[in-house]
Structure formats: C-alpha cells, structure tokens
C-alpha cells in the first residue's frame, strides 16, 4: 500500500509537469517564505505490534484530513519546513475489532535540499530529513482506559513542486515518520504501539 501511494504521487507529478506550458518561471530561492496546503493521508504500517503480553494485536487505521506546512529557504538549494495539521483521529483495531481510537498532532520539522533550487526549472524536486514530535489525546477504549505517551522520532521526506507562476505551484510530498508510543491500559503498562506512518499530501504551494 505504501509503495503504491508513493508511486502514484511521483507518477502524477511527472505527468502534470509534461502538460504544463513551456517557458521560464522564477523558481523559489534564498530568502523566500512559503506555505503548502492540501489533503494528507496518514497510512500507518501494517503491523503495529501487540499489547498486554500479546493478548491483543494492534492495527491502527488510515486517516485522511487537511494539512499544511510553513517553510523558509535560507539558501537557493536549502530550506526548512514544518508540517502541521488538524488533529488526525485514528480507529484502532484490537484482534480485528475496532475497540479503540486516538487523536494525534504530528508536527514534523525537516531540513530540505532542492537540487534545482535557484534555477528557472518548472519541476523542482526536493528531499528532506528531520525530527517529529507526536502529541496524543482523546484516547478511547471500549474495554477500559487507554493512555498513549507522546513520541519523538526521525522523519524523512520527498516532494516535488510544479511551478505555475512566481508565487503558485502544484505540490505533492510524502513523509516517513517514526512514531512509537508506549501504551497504558487501566493504569498498567501494556506495551508499545509502532505506528510508523507514510504521510502522503497533495495540494498547492504559495511563495510570499
């Protein structure tokens, strides 16, 4: 599922680039602030571990919602970007039954490299690496009380801007985020939930 989403993202981006009219567009460069806004799908990995000594297998469900980023280019080829979003609410299946849920906020800060930065190329790919902090809230469990600890983890990113004019671009991006949270059920330590999602986002980019 992850490979299909990433392949679709890149294929769509390249196809859109070939349809854009030829001509030069001023690319993003040093000193630019930008925002990216769109719809993001959070796809946790397929095996999220087990709880209560193996009594419950865990399956964290996918979720799609609004997301946005804020970024700054401190060099033609280098920048930083913060991924933010509305709280994502995930159903959690235990032994195949949806018995739990949680909300989380996953702000993710990445240092980015733009190989074509500072040029007038309409297609501007980039890669990034950084750190994530995930805040969990509103945990619910049908068979008791659930608590999930906040999480720190590494993050990696790949994306592409398809420039429309000096301010606007189409954008597609994907992040891999390391999210592991310790779970407590009815006050007792129950194990670790390994979410480790792929986040795929598509939308618009605007340069200020």
Question: How would you name each of these model-derived features?
Answer:
Residues 30-32, 39-41, 45, 69-141, ...:
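Gram-negative (and chloroplast) outer-membrane scaffold detector with strong preference
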Residues 89-91, 101, 165-208:
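Predominantly the C-terminal beta-signal and adjacent terminal strand-loop region
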């Amino acid at each position: 599922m992850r490979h299909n989403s990433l392949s679709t993202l890149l294929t769509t981006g390249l196809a859109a680039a070939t349809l854009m009219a030829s001509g030069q567009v001023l690319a993003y460069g040093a000193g630019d602030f930008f925002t990216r806004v769109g719809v993001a799908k959070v796809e946790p990995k397929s095996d999220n571990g087990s709880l209560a000594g193996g009594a419950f297998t865990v399956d964290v469900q996918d979720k799609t919602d609004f997301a946005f980023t804020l970024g700054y280019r401190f060099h033609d080829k280098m920048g930083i970007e913060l991924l933010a979003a509305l709280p994502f609410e995930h159903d959690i299946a235990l032994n195949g039954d949806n018995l739990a849920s949680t909300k989380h906020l996953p702000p993710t800060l990445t240092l980015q490299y733009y190989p074509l930065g500072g040029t007038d190329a309409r297609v501007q790919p980039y890669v990034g690496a950084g750190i994530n902090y995930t805040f969990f809230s509103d945990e619910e469990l049908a068979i008791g009380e659930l608590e999930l600890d906040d999480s720190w983890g590494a993050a990696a990113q790949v994306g592409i801007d398809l420039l429309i004019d000096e301010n606007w671009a189409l954008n597609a991006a994907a992040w891999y985020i390391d999210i592991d949270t310790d779970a407590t059920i009815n006050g007792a330590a129950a194990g670790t939930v390994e979410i480790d999602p792929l986040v795929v986002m598509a939308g618009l980019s605007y340069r200020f």
